Amino acid sequence: VRAENGPTCIVMRPSADDPNKTKFTWLLSIDLKGWIPKTIINKVLSQTQVDFANHLRQRMADNSVSKEMAPAC
């Protein structure tokens, strides 16, 4: 499969409503260039993004991850 990645961006900003929360915005543009219908691809990709966010949330909540270890962008 020869996929093409378009513009992709992850933005994390403090929540305006709760200082203990972060607003996570992920823009993803990918064309898999295959025969699979785009409706199926979009559903799978959106679920993959949800899974990624859940794993990220779980990792950040883990007590073994300290703020000092978090990489800077």
Swiss-Prot record:
Lipid metabolism recorded as keyword: no
Coiled coil: none
Cross-referenced SUPFAM superfamilies: Bet v1-like
Chief location of this protein within or outside the cell: mitochondrion
Localization (cell): Mitochondrion
Biochemical pathway: Steroid metabolism; cholesterol metabolism
Gene Ontology biological process terms from the UniProt entry: cholesterol metabolic process; intracellular cholesterol transport; regulation of steroid biosynthetic process; steroid biosynthetic process
GO cellular component, one term: mitochondrion
Domain START: 1-65
Subunit structure: May interact with TSPO.
Name under which the protein is recorded: Steroidogenic acute regulatory protein
UniProt organism field: Salvelinus alpinus
The organism's taxonomic lineage, starting at the top: Eukaryota, Metazoa, Chordata, Craniata, Vertebrata
